[in-house]
A protein has these predicted regions:
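A general boundary/transition motif marking the beginning of the first structured unit of a protein
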Residues: 1-5, 169, 222
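Outer membrane beta-barrel
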Residues: 41-62, 77-216, 224-231, 235-236
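N-terminal periplasmic/intermembrane-space "pro-region" immediately following the signal or transit peptide
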Residues: 3, 7, 15, 19-69, ...
C-alpha cells in the first residue's frame, strides 16, 4: 500500500513538472516572437530610398561653330567649354505614410549662368492619396508640369541627349511650383512603373489624367504676377 502511494506521488510530481516546463517553454516562445515582431517593426524612415545618377559630356567633338550657345539649353555649348557635368543628382523618395509619398531631388551640377555651378532643388513634393489604392492623388510642391511626353521622361530614360526645344521652351526645366491632381487605376500605375523599370522609355507615372495650377515662373522662382498657369494632360 505504501509502495503504491509513493509511486502515485512520484507520477503526480512528474506530471506537474512536465506541465510547468511546457507552459514556461510556450511562454518563452511567445515572448521571443513578440520581441522579434517589435524589433522588426519598420519606422517611417525605413521606407526612404536613396538613389542617384550623374551625366558627363564632352561637346567639342565634331564642333563646327564655337559661337553657338543657348542659355536655356545645354550650358556647355560653344565658347571654351569642353568636359561638363550635365547632371549630378541624388533622389530621396518613399512612402512615409500609407497615403503620403515624398520625393526630393537636388541637383549638384546646375548652372546659374555660363560659368558658375550651384546646388539647386529640382524636385521637392509630396503626393497625398485620397484612397487606399492610391488611384486618386494630389501632388503639392515643385515637380514636373504635366505637359508633353519628352518633358515627363527622366533624363535616365530618354533616348535623345536633350529634350526638343519646341516643347521644352514652354516650361523651362520642366518644373514649377504648384498643385496637381492625378488619376490612374492601380493596374495602369503598375504598368507605368513597369515601362520605366524594364527600360522601355516610359514617361513615368503621371496618371491617365492630370490637371493642376502652377506659378508659371519655372523652378526655384517665386510668383511674380499673381497669375497662375493651368496645365492638363491625358494619356492612354
Amino acid at each position: 500500500m505504501s509502495f503504491t502511494s509513493n509511486f502515485q506521488k512520484q507520477i503526480f510530481i512528474y506530471l506537474v513538472c512536465c506541465f510547468l516546463f511546457t507552459a514556461n517553454y510556450s511562454f518563452s516562445q511567445k515572448s521571443e516572437v513578440k520581441a522579434d515582431e517589435t524589433s522588426k517593426a519598420k519606422k517611417w524612415y525605413d521606407n526612404i530610398n536613396i538613389r542617384g545618377y550623374a551625366q558627363i559630356r564632352y561637346n567639342k567633338l565634331f564642333e563646327t561653330n564655337s559661337n553657338l550657345g543657348c542659355e536655356q539649353c545645354d550650358k556647355s555649348w560653344g565658347g571654351t567649354n569642353s568636359f561638363f557635368i550635365r547632371r549630378g543628382r541624388i533622389v530621396f523618395s518613399g512612402d512615409v505614410h500609407e497615403r503620403v509619398y515624398i520625393y526630393v531631388q537636388p541637383d549638384f551640377a546646375s548652372a546659374a549662368g555660363t560659368t558658375n555651378m550651384i546646388f539647386q532643388i529640382r524636385d521637392a513634393y509630396f503626393d497625398l492619396s485620397l484612397d487606399s489604392k492610391k488611384e486618386y492623388r494630389f501632388r503639392f510642391g515643385q515637380s514636373k508640369v504635366p505637359y508633353g511626353f519628352e518633358n515627363m521622361q527622366s533624363s535616365q530614360n530618354r533616348l535623345a541627349l536633350d529634350r526638343n526645344d519646341a516643347l521644352n521652351s514652354a516650361v523651362s526645366n520642366e518644373r514649377d511650383l504648384g498643385v496637381f491632381f492625378y488619376w490612374a487605376p492601380k493596374n495602369k500605375r503598375e504598368l507605368f512603373s513597369k515601362l520605366v523599370n524594364t527600360g522601355l522609355k516610359g514617361s513615368g507615372d503621371y496618371g491617365i489624367f492630370g490637371i493642376g495650377f502652377y506659378n508659371g515662373q519655372t523652378a526655384n522662382r517665386p510668383e511674380a504676377n499673381n497669375n497662375q498657369h493651368l496645365a492638363a494632360r491625358i494619356s492612354y
